[in-house]
Amino acid sequence: MKVLISPKDEFEAKAAVNGGADIIDVKNPDEGSLGANFPWIIRQVRNLVPQSIEVSATIGDFPHLPGSASLAALGAAVSGSNYVKVGLKGSKTLEEAFFLMHHVTRAVKEYDLNTKVVLAGYADYHRAETLDPFLLPEVARSAGCDVVMVDTFIKDGKRLFDFMDDACCKRFIDKGHEKDLEVALAGSIKLQDIPILKRTGADIIGIRGAACSHGDRLAGAIQAENVRALMDLAKQS
């Protein structure tokens, strides 16, 4: 299981690398759950991070604007991301979801076939008024994505496990694996959640808050020692 740590700038990225993170995921928490950062921040992080470590970038909790999403996704890929992550916020039907993600995938793959596209849905989909995440593995497969992910949209202290217990997470992972997708889980994950997440069979877990000082995803900053504690537990056999 890989651990993805989400810095907002090159200083936090350096701390994440020093802590041993598997994937460095550039985001802007001030713009939401999957808030997008600036292209030059992605480039700075890619230049800082050793080539052996993959870089991811979020492009936002996206409304149903397929053209805008495609252009943003291409921008993230050109800026050096190995993964381009799209929060499927505004697409209200399976047809809309497929249309947006198909064009995102086309934009990214025409630039670089090796860049992975991540379709991210929300465990708190009733609150976010988005699609049920269990519908998304099929959308991701049909649209040519590489990874399907579930996160939480509203960051109010509620966690992934408040909306999906470990058995539910495992069912989501199994659905993704049946479609030959990698599966990622995120959503205010704490240190004590890691052993449970390992048992679900997740390929990737995404963390920001637990890696930050005082556990604060907005006011805190990622600390190498916090990342190291997360990594040590994640890599225990």
Task: Give the ranges of each region predicted by the language model.
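N-terminal amphipathic alpha-helix/helix-capping segment at the start of soluble metabolic enzymes
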Residues: 1-6, 43-47, 112-114, 171
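N-terminal basic/disordered segments at the start of proteins
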Residues: 2-22
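Glycine-rich, positively charged N-terminal anion/phosphate-binding segment
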Residues: 10, 32-50
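Conserved, mostly hydrophobic/aromatic
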Residues: 16, 148, 197, 230
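Glycine-rich phosphate-binding active-site loops on the catalytic face of alpha/beta enzymes
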Residues: 23-35, 78-93, 147-157, 200-227
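C-terminal helical cap(s) of enzyme catalytic domains, especially alpha/beta-barrels
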Residues: 39-45, 92-107, 207-237
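Conserved anion-binding
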Residues: 51-56, 60-160, 175-179, 192
